[in-house]
Amino acid sequence: MGKFEVYVDASGKYRWRLKAVNGQVVATGGQGYATARSCREGIESVKKHSATAEIVEVEA
């Protein structure tokens, strides 16, 4: 099973990354969060909305 990791970056912001079973990073949060709690809320939002998200192709 994959896992979300919460960590603190060099500027002191909380960030998350999603790792696959093999340890490969497959997604990262696009922003830094001021608190660990707000970072976890960001993860929960991704989990909630990605379950029903469409896949759309966009042209460059």
Model-derived segments and spans:
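Short N-terminal "domain-start" leader segments
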Residues: 1-15, 19-21, 27-29, 45-59
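Amphipathic, hydrophobic secondary-structure cores in small proteins
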Residues: 25-33, 38, 42
